[in-house]
Amino acid sequence: MKDVREILKKRPLLFDGGMGTYYKAKPGQECEQANLLDPDGILTVHRAYLEAGADAIKTNTFGLPRMAAAQNPMWEAMADEGWKLAAQAAAKTSAAVFADLGPAPDTEALPAAQIYTALAERFAALGAKNFLFETLSSD
């Protein structure tokens, strides 16, 4: 796995595209659930992006902050499997893997910072060194 800082010294970093758009999860199923229910499908998408030339792929975990906030008991398993699948897909390449985290609701009962801390700690324990916090509002 290349150090993304070395790539960025030479050129922009080329990420994969949207997992949910490419995967087209089954109706009523969150894309992140496919980490557990269709791991081969998620691996196929990761590998397609790598074969297309992506320098980095994102874990299929964009929606986890929302799930963790809703206290979905499966968020940890989805995080673990999301990391495992992305790392497996990138293992024989020079691509970097980023733990991907989308927007989290910010409530008094469960502040967004607490959600992001729990998720970041989980991914760090799994070996993540790169994180992408995306599609966040400035509110």
Residue ranges and their predicted role:
Residues 1-139:
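Domain-level signal for soluble alpha/beta catalytic cores
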